[in-house]
Regions:
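Short gly/ser-rich loop at a beta-strand->alpha-helix junction or flexible surface loop bordering the NTP-binding
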Residues: 2-201
Length: 201
């Protein structure tokens, strides 16, 4: 491999890692020109930190509070979107601190999740997804709707709605419109949460 090819591969991998919070997969490294032996070499030398099977982090890249979300998104092959209660935590709406990481994956996703992950299967429309630092996350509105669908308690939902409105992330009319798309318990729960949120605004 020429010196130019090595430099190009290093640049491609670095740019990719930067877009993913300093992380990358073995498959991504291979596509950038790093065969398995070279990957082992960089891991042994400490240039790359092995975070999980087939997932590395650049040693010089600082850790952040979102490392686990980047890591588990990569574990899905990059198809997951951080969602539900985990998305609420990312947007800092309510003081909800979920014990598990909630990810939405396409219906055909078959990988078995570890105990720390809760998978939800759905096809998310592009308008319900935002790019964050190294991972994708559902919008505040979609996060609240999804949380209502899995019956997060009304107090947490109310806190989430109130915080989202105060931060200018959405207006209460958006919640009203979302309630109209829901049925049964989820619609009732979100409606009750909106009424409670309005009392504290």
């Amino acid at each position: 491999m020429s010196r130019r090819a090595v430099q190009d591969g290093r640049r491609r991998l670095y740019e990719l890692a930067v877009s993913q919070g300093g992380y990358f997969t073995a498959a991504q490294a291979r596509a950038a020109g790093y065969p398995k032996q070279l990957q082992y070499y960089h891991a042994r030398r400490g240039n790359w930190v092995r975070e999980d099977r087939g997932i590395y982090r650049l040693w010089e890249w600082p850790r952040s509070g979102y490392d686990d979300l980047v890591l588990w998104t990569l574990w899905t092959g990059g198809v997951a979107v951080v969602s539900h209660q985990s998305a609420m935590a990312v947007h800092d709406i309510s003081d909800l601190m979920p014990a598990k990481i909630h990810l939405t994956v396409p219906p055909g996703f078959r990988k078995k999740p570890p105990p720390v992950i809760v998978l939800h299967r759905d096809l998310l429309p592009p308008q319900d997804v935002e790019q964050h630092e190294g991972f994708r996350v559902t919008t505040p509105l979609r996060a609240l709707v999804d949380a209502a669908r899995v019956a997060v308690d009304v107090e947490r939902l109310s806190d989430g709605i109130r915080d989202a409105i105060r931060k200018g992330l959405l207006a209460d009319r958006h919640i009203e419109e979302a309630i109209g798309t829901l049925q049964g318990e989820a619609a009732e729960l979100l409606g009750q949460a909106l009424m409670e949120a309005r009392r504290s605004l």
